[in-house]
């Protein structure tokens, strides 16, 4: 209803920022083209640690492999010249909900609105590690496979922002067994969007050729946060 409920002990006239947990610092840093590794929080933290001679706190990257396996599912990359690496991880028993307050706050501080717990995870990783990701609703993926290929001339896709694009062989697409489900490195397709009823998710993390993604983005007039990260060359440790 648009009302903000404050704690009962909130004092009239007091600064509201500490009450809302907003008494924080935001660094607005202009990154030059030769330092894409500083485009994310991890990269910037590494740089600051080196300058100050401090120990870098590595992010926790451990997970249980059994939680992300899907039997009989396969990934085929038919355009390795513009997609040298593609990984897909399956997660089941998912419940779409609101992200925890701390994650919503951190995303808001970097200008990203919260959508859902699953989508917010991909955006959080983008800003923390500089790795673009995408999440597909697995129930909409046909044929139990992901195929990374060049688009067919005249092939069409409707992206998450409900825009339809006619593609050609210069465009890289992510497909299931029958159809295109994402514009690689640019935006996912509406036909596999995460929704409130999603219970199975396929997470994508990949390395795409920056020149191809940049040219496709410009030719189609379709930009996104993923494009701004994909078209930069990142150190191997920060990829995928």
Where are these regions (language model features)?
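RNA/tRNA-interacting regions in translation and RNA-turnover enzymes
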Residues: 1-234, 238
